[in-house]
Amino acid sequence: MPRALIPPSNPIWPDGNRCAVALAFDVDGPTGDAMLDGSLLHNFRYFSEGAYGPWRALPRLLDLLADYGLKATFFVPTWVVQHWTDRCEKILGGGHEIAYHGHRHEVFMDCSPQRQLEIMMVSREIFQSRLGVTPVGFRTPSGDWSEETANLLADFGVIYSSSMRGDDRPYFHLRGDGSRALVEIPARPDIDDYTALAYFEDPDFPAGLDRISDYRLVEQNWCREFQGYYRDGLCWTTILHPKVVAKPGRLGILEGLFKDIRRHENVWIAHCAEVADWWTAQDKIVEG
């Protein structure tokens, strides 16, 4: 089993801030299972539902983040970078971070280590050639990875992951010899918009979901989640998708959430990479 270093109970954040907020969005577009199994080629409506994310929803989301002076991390499959390069350039132009999320949203848990490395190499080349950046962060597509993935990512130059769910503070994945592999910034499914807002008739995804939650209740739930992390001094990140949450009617949910974050004092708004750098630096201070 992969090993992890248990984090301190009471994290310390820069400049005396009470908690950390690392907003994160997955710009999946039409990538994912239907692209991987080939069915997307024969389902143009489903393709258009995914394409709506980078084409229409992403610019709207970037404008809202700018309105509230918030920065975020965007995990982007590089197939999306290839097909909507200009939209991805606007992410960087807005002062946000871009990070790895597979090429076509592959299921890393089902990929051999060699295949995982191939995907990372393809992704890096596309990020460098299209956007002139080399990401340092990773969120596993489809939510899980194999036992070898953490070490593979660290050897590839990745410094953090936001893939696991088992804590509300950053922690370190450990190598077999006990040394640090990379920082984990865990995100909880409580703040995954698919849980409350995603509904596709065909294919049936998420399976069995036959309703959309009341937007007012979704906003209240997400604000409560943030408030709990603020109260306890933790690190709050999100699993949100422009194609799901950044539609005209739903943008009010995000606006209510952003207002609530801004109403609270001593909140460190950070890229995930900044959280990882801080966590690593604090660990070195403790060791020293």
Roles of regions detected by a PLM:
Residues M1-G137, S142-D190, R216-T238, A246-G288:
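Catalytic alpha-helical scaffold of carbohydrate-active enzymes acting on polysaccharides/glycoconjugates
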Residues S48, P135, E201-D214, H241-K243:
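Surface-exposed cleft-lining segments at the edges of enzyme active sites
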Residues P186-G208:
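Glycine-rich, positively charged active-site loop/lid region within alpha/beta enzyme cores that binds
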